[in-house]
Amino acid sequence: VSGTHGKTSTTSMLSHILIEAKKDPTISVGGMLPLIGGNLKIGKEEFFLTEACEYTNSFLELSPNVEVILNIEADHLDFFKDLDDIRKSFKKFIAKLDDNGILIINEKISNKEELLDGFSGKVYSFGLGKGYVNAKNINYDFEGKAEFDLYVEDKFTGKIKLSVYGEHNILNALAAIATGMALDISLEDIKRGLEGYGGVHRRFEIKGTVKGLTVIDDYAHHPGEIEATIEAAKKLKYKRLCVVFQPHTYSRTKALLEDFARVLSKADLVVLADIYAAREKDTLGVSSKDIETLINKKSQKAYYFPTFDEIESFVLSKLDKGDICITMGAGDIYKLGEDILGI
C-alpha cells in the first residue's frame, strides 16, 4: 500500500477485511492497530500486507503482486528533487509488477497513462463519483462519520457505513474495497471488515475531553493530510476549531511553507510549536514563525510559542466548552494533548 498519505489507514482497513474473510495474513502497518494488538502480525497464509514508503526509494526493494497507489504529492524533498522525480519513482514501483500483477490506483492522480505506460497487468481505479469502484451520495452522521452508495462498474452494489471520519477515509476505504474485490473477497466480508475498523493510533484519534474541550490527535504532517484532517473535523459539531501544529523536518517546512500556511488557515485558531527536526539539522534558516507570519498576513489567527508549557497555557486560556483542539504532526506533539487532558 503506497502513496504520499493514507498508507497506515488503508493498510489497517485491509487488515480488517482480510481477517474478516478468514484469511490469516502477515501484516506490517505503520501504526498501532488494535485488531492485531500492535503493528505486526505473523500469519500462516500466503498474504503479506505491508505499507510501501517511497522515501529513499525504499519501496523499490519490494516485489509485490498487488500494489495500491493512494496519491502522489510533493513530499520528502530532502531526497527527491521535485514532484516529477517522485512520479518517476512511482513509475519504477509499478514496473515491479509482472504481467499478472494487479494495480489499484486513485483515478484523480494526474497523467495516469504516463505512469501506466508499459504495464500490462490489471488496473482497478477508485474515486469519488468516478472510477471502477466509486462512492456516490455521501452523507455524514451527527458524529461526522460517512455513509455512501458504493458503485462498481457504474452499478449500485450497496451502502457502506464507516466508523472513521472524513472524506479522505472514504477514499482509503474505496482503495481497500477495490483491493479486496481484486483478491476475490466477497462484498459482504469487505463491508463487515470496514464496519469493524474504528481507526488506528494517532489517526484522528479522539483522546478525550476536559471542561467540555475535545482533544484530538493526528499524525498529519503534510499539507494534503492537514487539509483532509481539518475538513474531517469540520464535519463534527463544535464552536471553534484550534489546530496545534508541530512541523516535521526543516526541509519539508521550507519546501512547502506556503502550502502549510494555506491549509492551516482553514482552522479558526492556529498554534505553532517548534519544528521537530527528526533526522535533520537546522541549516535552512526556516522556523515555525515563518508559517505564523504567512498566516497572519491574511488573518490574525496564528500564534507561535517555543515551549509546550506555553502552548498548553495558551490553549486552556483561549478555548472553551464546545471547542475542538487537534494536536497535529509526526513528532512528539501528541504529548501536549495528553498534558492538556492530564493523562
For the regions a protein language model found, what residue spans apply to each?
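Phosphate-binding loop of NTP-binding sites
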Residues: 1-107, 111-122, 174, 180-181
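A glycine-rich beta-strand to alpha-helix segment
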Residues: 310-341
